[in-house]
Structures are given as structure tokens and as C-alpha cells.
Regions:
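Extracytoplasmic metal-acquisition and chelation regions
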Residues: 1-239
Length: 239
């Protein structure tokens, strides 16, 4: 929960950049001037993002990314929006616009970020079209929407993890069976929220020589955002 000092700092800020989607509602709901807020996802109460009228499935997001790669998509209420290259472009553009509005001679641009994001997308497009991947939690949805690979994570398991719930025993068993049966080419694993269930799935992947790419919610200590982003997309692009 925010302290009174946290709320005071937020209200004093000329610009507040937030995740949105309920992830950091504690801070943006406390700000009196909502016009100072720049968000990657719609501002909403926690757990209400899936009620966004623009919410879509991962398959729909993949189709959208082909037609309009710059469009930010809300994939089933998934809050890991900073892995969406389109969101990076949009937020950067909003920041530049606000800076230029406040300081007419600032000349803020997004050229470097736009170029960097295009390179990230190109790396992701290198993934094979027939790649079957699964995730211990849907951390890479916004990256994988730029690929033709198929998310074969069992539906029940995916629904539970995207809503931050605990998967049912049957869904975990289905996940491990899919790995044992050779239906998973790549496992995406979040080491920062490793649970007993996720560890079992990772062990099954290791036992079956399934490639594993680790993607955390935030960069490891000592690593900058873009550095980690490049590392993650490079690892994915090798498969």
C-alpha cells in the first residue's frame, strides 16, 4: 500500500508513467490530476482489465499484429504490457508529446526507440512458423503475438495463471503430458515467480530435452531494461 509520502510525490509529479490495467492502481487512483498520467494499458481497478471492450485472445492479437504491428493490444487482461513493442512506442510517443507541449524547444523525438523496436520485431519474426510453445505463466504473450508460433499451454492452466490463480491438478497434469508427448517445442519460464507447479513443469521440460527460455517480469539486478529486452528477444529468435 502507498504511504502518504508516496501519494504526495505522485501528486507533485508533472508526469506519471504507469503500467495501468489495475497492476499499479494504488498509485494512479490516488492522483488528483489524471491528465498527468501516461499508461500502457487502460486505467482500471485490479482484476477488471479483462472487461475492456477491446480485450482479445492471443490468436486475435497475432492477427492484429500482422495487419497493424503498431497497435497496442489487451490480450485477455494480461498485465505484462511492457513486453509489447507497440506499447513501448506508444508510451514513448506520449512522453515526447507531453514534454514538447510543456517545453516547446525541447525537440523530444522517439526515433531511436522506434528504430530499436523495429529491430526487436524483426528478431521475433525469425521464429519458425510451426513452433509450438507453452508458458508457465503468460509473460511473453505480447512478444509472441509477433510470431506465427502456436501457444499450446492447456487452456485451463492458462486461464488460471493469467488471473493469478492456482492451476487445477488436472490442468497441470495436462501440461506435463503435453511435454512428455512431444507437443511442446519451447517452454517459456518466469524464474522470478517460481512455484512448485512451475518447477515441476520446468523439470518435465528438462527431462524431455525441451528448449527453455527464461523471461522475468523485471530485468535482473544490474541489467538495464533495453539490455534485458534485447537478450530476451535474441534468445527467442534462436528457436
Amino acid at each position: 500500500e502507498p504511504t502518504a509520502a508516496d501519494i504526495a510525490k505522485a501528486n507533485d509529479a508533472d508526469m506519471l508513467v504507469v503500467n495501468g490495467g489495475g497492476y499499479d492502481a494504488w498509485i494512479y487512483q490516488a492522483v488528483s490530476d489524471q491528465d498527468n498520467i501516461i499508461s500502457a494499458l487502460p486505467l482500471t481497478d485490479h482484476g477488471k482489465l479483462d472487461e475492456d471492450p477491446d480485450v482479445m485472445t492471443i490468436d486475435a492479437a497475432k492477427a492484429t499484429a500482422k495487419d497493424d504491428p503498431d497497435k497496442v493490444t489487451n490480450i485477455e487482461g494480461n498485465e505484462h504490457i511492457w513486453y509489447d513493442p507497440a506499447a513501448l512506442e506508444e508510451v514513448a510517443g506520449s512522453i515526447a508529446d507531453q514534454i514538447n507541449e510543456e517545453y516547446s524547444d525541447a525537440g523530444a523525438t522517439t526515433e531511436k526507440i522506434d528504430s530499436h523496436v523495429d529491430q526487436l520485431r524483426d528478431k521475433l519474426k525469425e521464429l519458425p512458423d510451426d513452433l509450438n510453445y507453452a508458458q508457465t505463466e503468460p509473460i511473453a504473450d505480447y512478444l509472441m503475438k509477433y510470431t506465427d508460433g502456436k501457444d499450446v499451454t492447456p487452456e485451463g492452466y492458462r486461464k488460471a495463471t493469467i488471473s493469478e490463480g492456482e492451476p487445477a491438478t488436472a490442468d497441470v497434469a495436462a501440461f506435463i503430458k503435453a511435454i512428455d508427448d512431444g507437443e511442446v517445442d519451447l517452454l517459456i519460464f518466469n524464474p522470478q515467480t517460481e512455484t512448485d507447479t512451475a518447477s515441476r513443469i520446468k523439470s518435465a521440460a528438462e527431462d524431455n530435452d525441451v528448449d527453455i527460455v527464461e523471461i522475468g517480469e523485471t530485468p535482473p539486478d544490474g541489467k538495464k531494461f533495453w539490455e534485458y529486452y534485447d537478450e530476451v528477444t535474441s534468445k527467442l529468435g534462436k528457436h
